[in-house]
Amino acid sequence: MTERSMLLELKQVGYRTATTKIVNNISFTLQRGEFKLITGPSGCGKSTLLKMVASLISPDIGVILFEGQDITTLSPEAYRQQVSYCVQTPALFGDTVYDNLIFPWQIRHQRPQPTAFADDLARFELPETILQKPIAALSGGEKQRIALIRNLQFLPKILLLDEITSALDEHNKRNVNDIIHRYVRDKQVAVLWVTHDKDEIQHADKVITLTPSAGEMQEARYERA
């Protein structure tokens, strides 16, 4: 087994509102090619934790390191290309699917590889003709898959996924789970995935469980049968 390099480290991270501790004293690491799930009941701070890692909100205490650097010292634009965040309700823009998939390449001032879109669309069981489909004509499941494909165009080192299969039927949910699992192994991308779905645990290297009382965190390795 090749040695994994550390991409992300959280050290005693916490976040609170004026009256409530949402997340408290969270510490863990994420290595290249590692697949971690974050689970727990509603309101225990799962999405807040992911937003802090995405640098959308800042922790009140503690530090988050990306490749050894405090993320508050990094360019937000550059960081978010390497750490890609995909949410439960995807925000697509422009007129067509193509407008969304070309966007990450435009930011990098690069041309996409000739088969970049076709390969990823095929992985997610979407036809290449969908590139010209209006955003308004997409189903909820199509929007979620397109948003995920768009995130992959950034060629990220870390994928942050927040309940991304919630709008999918069972077939597409299993398909997305399998695709992400293979993508992690093939590209050595790290994944931090917030989910309520116990079926997704089978792909995880480790599972982080947050409890309703902030400050309680359990981390367990998932033992495959």
Which residues does each PLM region occupy?
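Conserved ABC transporter NBD signature motif
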Residues: 62-70, 79
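Conserved catalytic motifs of ABC-family nucleotide-binding domains
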Residues: 90-99, 108
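Catalytic Walker B motif of ABC-type/P-loop ATPase nucleotide-binding domains
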Residues: 159-163
